A protein has these predicted regions:
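A glycine-rich helix N-cap at a beta->alpha junction
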Residues: 1-13, 22-25, 29, 34
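Acidic, metal-coordinating catalytic cores used for nucleic-acid/nucleotide bond scission
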Residues: 12-16, 129
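Short, surface-exposed amphipathic charged segments that create phosphate/polyanion-binding patches used
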Residues: 21-27, 165-170
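Surface-exposed charge patches
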Residues: 24, 138, 184
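Short polybasic/polar patches that bind polyanions
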Residues: 27, 141, 187
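Active-site cores that bind ATP or allylic diphosphates and position pyrophosphate for catalysis
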Residues: 34-175, 193
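A conserved active-site cap/scaffold subdomain adjacent to cofactor or substrate pockets
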Residues: 181, 186-188, 192
């Protein structure tokens, strides 16, 4: 379908050292705490309401690591497709996990570190990830990373409202009909065929 990587692909499974370095920088800045709350102690949204934030702990502890989000923290950005966005991060999402209790680094941290390492300037992805963007910008700001431009595309859903994706067992695209597939995608996005496709 004409989509090719500009550089070698980064695999999160090989990037643990880079994520640990970013965690150390966040901890040095006082932006993290370790949370030993069991599932039963967390509220319905998975938010820590205990005293973990105020206890003397380090990221070396074998517990989940959370970002400290000030209660008055607000994130604003202009999405290239969805328009101006404003999220009261401290009120709506609170202290989110950046490293899980099992030692795996959370998506929010991993994608921020990898985007910065690759010099990503524009992120184009599905609108189902729009609510992840404020958390990623929050981490970018605290790590002194540049914030890329974001464009969140509408996603195709099934009759039950599920995203049409591999995860939900959608059939794979037929590479033998790439031009037709691209035309369908462009029409879904209300875009005209580019000149190179007009006679394809």
């Amino acid at each position: 379908h004409g989509l090719h990587w500009d550089e070698p692909v980064l695999y999160q499974s090989t990037r643990s050292a880079a994520y640990t370095t970013a965690l150390a920088a966040l901890a040095q800045g006082g932006h993290l705490f370790s949370c030993d709350c069991s599932r039963g102690k967390l509220d319905a949204d998975g938010v820590c309401r205990g005293d973990c934030r105020t206890r003397q702990q380090t990221i070396a502890d074998p517990w989940a690591i959370r970002a400290i989000v000030p209660s008055d923290c607000a994130i604003r950005f202009a999405d290239l497709l969805q328009g101006p966005q404003h999220t009261a991060l401290g009120a709506s999402l609170a202290d989110f996990v950046v490293r899980r209790k099992d030692g795996l680094h959370a998506y929010q941290l991993a994608v921020v570190v990898d985007d910065a390492a690759q010099g990503i300037t524009h992120v184009v992805r599905g609108s189902d990830l729009l609510d992840s963007t404020p958390r990623q910008i929050f981490l970018q700001q605290r790590l002194a990373y540049a914030t890329p431009s974001y464009a969140h595309l509408p996603v195709i859903t099934t009759g039950q409202g599920q995203k049409f994706s591999k995860q939900n067992h959608a059939p794979a695209l037929d590479n033998d009909h790439a031009v037709t597939n691209l035309r369908h995608a462009l029409r879904f996005l209300h875009q005209a065929d580019p000149p190179a496709m007009l006679n394809a």
